[in-house]
């Protein structure tokens, strides 16, 4: 019996060490907040003339409680309150204010300073909660659901949008959410070439599958250890 317990403890320790190793790999290689690369400063990101990947995590220009178009921002920017936020910094539209509702509308904006030679770029958006319009260089590039509060219709989906750009490019995302657990943009958008953005999407899917398989393995192992312990006690 002591030998069985010894082997069981060694197996538990091995599974625990494996779990810690997997979580560390997720933190090291799938953490968009700690990934290398330039970040925006006060809503402006300088994109070098290379094929690098940019995780748009920091200092988005954010207009709370309102849906704006690029034209409205251009013409009346001084009339609207804005602040700089990081993606995922807050779990809702309340911006950490406990007296406000976590639901509502908001507009995110970032300016890209691109190389002078025109290139094709892609921006990957993961599950924005729960309806939005994406504008690039003043044009409506895509829409999920309907963020208009009076005609609200949610639609949550991973999407990739491509565009040609050089010089200066403006990204505007107008978002509305009425009842999700987390509101607004909670997952870091990624900017790169279309090929790299799609590779990253594929890797993220693979990591999710591996994580689910590992979780299932731990569950089966826990049931096995429970049944084995019951037999030993009997």
Indicate residue ranges for each PLM-predicted region:
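Core alpha-helical transmembrane segments of integral membrane proteins
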Residues: 198-234
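Beta-strand-enriched, solvent-exposed domains that form extended recognition/catalytic surfaces
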Residues: 117-119, 138, 156-158, 162
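Intrinsic-disorder/low-complexity, polar/charged segments enriched in Ser/Thr/Lys/Arg/Asp/Glu/Gln
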Residues: 55, 105-111, 120-122, 158-160, ...
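Aromatic-lined ligand-binding clefts that engage carbohydrates, nucleic acids, or primary amines
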Residues: 112-137, 171-173
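An acidic-aromatic loop/edge-strand motif
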Residues: 153-213
